[in-house]
Amino acid sequence: MTAISLGMPDVPTRLAERRKSRQIQVGPVAVGGDAPVSVQSMTTTRTSDIGATLQQIAELTASGCQIVRVACPTQDDADALPVIARKSQIPVIADIHFQPKYVFAAIEAGCAAVRVNPGNIKQFDDKVKEIAKAAKDHGTPIRIGVNAGSLDRRLLQKYGRATPEALAESALWEASLFEEHDFRDIKISVKHNDPVVMVEAYRQLAAQCDYPLHLGVTEAGPAFQGTIKSAVAFGALLSQGIGDTIRVSLSAPPVEEIKVGIQILESLNLRQRGLEIVSCPSCGRAQVDVYKLAEEVTAGLEGMEVPLRVAVMGCVVNGPGEAREADLGVASGNGKGQIFVKGEVIKTVPESKIVETLIDEAMKIAEQMEKDGVTSGEPSVSVAG
């Protein structure tokens, strides 16, 4: 009887049907409709420093970022946009606050899209007609980016604070102004630093419009805290089919935002998984140093892009079962390790040879996958108990 690997299902299970939304184009990247959920980030450089900004965009691109946003608070930043938009490997979105003149500058510069904050752009409502015409003439989508920290004063007076209702109403009101001028090439975000408020705001928004939605928890915090907040909020929404593009906001290097974003999508089967290391958290039953073993295997397989699940287990309780369900695995104990490939034990090796053997077998499987034309995903590492 042929063993079947349960590690990487060919047809991943989805938690809910995707919300039906209109599709827009942010450069070559489709957002909304049936397009895959994309991952984006924002540069931390001064946009006027063209070299540093393009270098950071290159690093983000290499990490899997699909869309990048750049700040544009000054005229020097606006002057840099044409070069950055032209030389960037991925679509560039200009992030505009306060000054409407920079919206027009970004459109003229050839940015793939422009984010506007209706809560703090001077006389924004009066400028919508001009912005809509310029954007339409250039084929430039507009992201209406509502943020709890800069909500329109009229809505703060009405609701008293940035409630889910206030955030959704602000976005829909501004979208309606663009619609009056026959402009619907729009995506929307309603960000809050509280995941519960943010989730409810997006739920309300999703029920009232068909625009693609950009998910984000604003000011999420340092890497650990921000990762938890974003994972909780995005998981709640994406599992209900809500969300078309995501940005994980972290007080950390932008590349870390991409790593977290990709992991979230992989965890929800919204993206092809890459390398996945499944390792037990260790306990008193463990007969090997699981931490060290997992770290060494991870380091040895760094950069592998085929969808391969490798189980590194430290005892006989869950070890054999987890190892059998992975594409490749080891169940350790009594100074040795049983090596499993596709559910079958292929050999038993001394503890000192476990890492070397796992890496060798992983390379063989990866080589065969590549010959078979298996689509590669983004490398990832996860820990399971």
Swiss-Prot record:
Designated name of the protein: 4-hydroxy-3-methylbut-2-en-1-yl diphosphate synthase (flavodoxin) 2
Pfam family, one: GcpE
EC numbers on record: 1.17.7.3
Keywords: 4Fe-4S, Iron, Iron-sulfur, Isoprene biosynthesis, Metal-binding, Oxidoreductase
Function text: Converts 2C-methyl-D-erythritol 2,4-cyclodiphosphate (ME-2,4cPP) into 1-hydroxy-2-methyl-2-(E)-butenyl 4-diphosphate.
GO biological process: isopentenyl diphosphate biosynthetic process, methylerythritol 4-phosphate pathway; terpenoid biosynthetic process
Swiss-Prot/TrEMBL catalytic activity: (2E)-4-hydroxy-3-methylbut-2-enyl diphosphate + oxidized [flavodoxin] + H2O + 2 H(+) = 2-C-methyl-D-erythritol 2,4-cyclic diphosphate + reduced [flavodoxin]
Family: Belongs to the IspG family.
This protein's pathway: Isoprenoid biosynthesis; isopentenyl diphosphate biosynthesis via DXP pathway; isopentenyl diphosphate from 1-deoxy-D-xylulose 5-phosphate: step 5/6
Cofactor: [4Fe-4S] cluster
Cofactor note as given: Binds 1 [4Fe-4S] cluster.
Binding site for [4Fe-4S] cluster: C280, C283, C315, E322
Gene3D superfamilies with a match to the protein in the record: Dihydropteroate synthase-like, Sulfite Reductase Hemoprotein, domain 1
Taxonomic superkingdom: Bacteria
InterPro entries per record: Dihydropteroate_synth-like_sf, IspG_bac, IspG_bac-typ, NO2/SO3_Rdtase_4Fe4S_sf
Organism (species): Streptomyces coelicolor (strain ATCC BAA-471 / A3(2) / M145)
Molecular functions per Gene Ontology: 4 iron, 4 sulfur cluster binding; 4-hydroxy-3-methylbut-2-en-1-yl diphosphate synthase activity (ferredoxin); 4-hydroxy-3-methylbut-2-enyl-diphosphate synthase activity (flavodoxin); iron ion binding
